[in-house]
Structures are given as C-alpha cells and as structure tokens.
Amino acid sequence: MALGYIQRYLPECLRLGHSRSTLRLKMIRSMPRYLLALLFLLTAMPFAKTALATTSCSPLLSHTFPRLQDEAPQNLCQYQGKVILVVNTASFCGFTSQYEGLEKLYAKYKDRGLVVLGFPSNDFGQQEPGSNKDIADFCKNTYDVKFPMFAKSSVSGSNPNPLFKMLIAKTGTTPKWNFYKYLIDRNGNVVDSFGSMTKPASSSITGEIEKLLGEKI
C-alpha cells in the first residue's frame, strides 16, 4: 500500500518540477500516519538486526584477556561469528615450530572467517619462562606471527584461565602439553579438540575448518 502511494504521488511531483529535497518533504507531510509508521519500521529493522547480532555473544567467548603485545584488554566477543582455533603455545618446546603452520593456516582462511587465538603458557615443562614482551618479540621475530596472541596465563591444573576452564568442561579434555588445539564454530560452540602431535596443516584440522566455514550462522 505504501509503495502504491509513492508510485501515484511521485510522477505528479516530478511533473510539477519539485526538487528532490522538496519532493521528499512533500511526500512525508502528505503521507497518512500509518504509512509513516510503516516506513519507519522498515527503515529501522536492518539496524535493529545488526545491533542484535553485535550484542549477542556466546558464553564461551564472554571473556576479556590482555593482548600479548601491550596488555590492552581484548574481549573475545569480537570473534563471535568466526571459526576459532584456540591454541596454548610455548616458545621453547619441541612443537614450537607449529607457529609457522598456525600462521599459514590463519593466512589461508582468515578472509573466509577463521581466526587463530594463541595463549602462551608456562604450564608444561616450564617452556614459556619469559615475559609477555619476550614472548611477543620471539613470535614476531622468529615466525612473524600475525594472528591474535594473549598474555601468558595458565591453561591447565587447578586454575586455568576462564576460556580454557570452559573448553575443558565442555570437551572433557584438558591440554596435555603445549600446542593443544580447540576448534570453535561460528556460533561459539566448541566442536573438536586436537592433540599436540596434530599439525595445523593436517587434514583432520583443515577438513573440519573447511566444513565449519561453509556453515551458516
């Protein structure tokens, strides 16, 4: 009905030579109130939908951690809607070379919606003894890591950080060593975990990532 009204009114206004701004004002003034209300609702709906999507966050991601480089607080809700690979890392481990594979994985899939999140930890073999700055410098200078990294924290034992505490509870699997991996879907649900021996480029990881990237939210 609103469209019909506009279609009837528009040609007449154009015939009379109204400017675009004058035309818009005359149309609005002459519209019945119910049409104005309908027009407002139709205009507001996309913004409401966007706001709802922005504010909705999975409990699994409702945590804030300091960024590794500068300890600026980072809310994990910013990654809602992405496929997420969470990894506990260490600088002096036999699996440290997996940084290279993780960075390649991130570079390959990030434009399709994958993000890798690194959580340095000194829990296993005391293989992450340095400061956050030491770790950040090592990651940058040795592997040119660009995926998000967070300040050193515990990921196992009696006091794991809040994210790993939830990952452990939901999977029933605790990290057994450095470079343990948890895969989270676009809706913020953990769907799988992989041991330290499973390389980032393995088909078990990439196949699952491909599948999750293809799923709609």
Label every PLM stretch briefly.
Residues L36-P46:
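Bacterial N-terminal signal peptides
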Residues Q80-I84, K110-V115, Y143-P148, N178, ...:
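Loop/turn elements at helix/coil->beta-strand transitions in domains of secreted/extracellular proteins
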Residues N88-F92:
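Amphipathic alpha-helical repeat scaffolds
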Residues K49-C77, S97, P162:
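N-terminal "domain-start" segment that seeds a small globular fold
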Residues C13, S21, L25-L36:
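Bacterial N-terminal signal peptides that target proteins for export
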Residues F95-P160:
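Structural microenvironment flanking redox-active thiols in thiol-disulfide oxidoreductases
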Residues Y5-Y9, H18:
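Low-complexity, intrinsically disordered or signal/transmembrane-proximal segments
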Residues P162-K165, A169-I217:
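Thiol-/selenol-based redox modules, centered on thioredoxin-like
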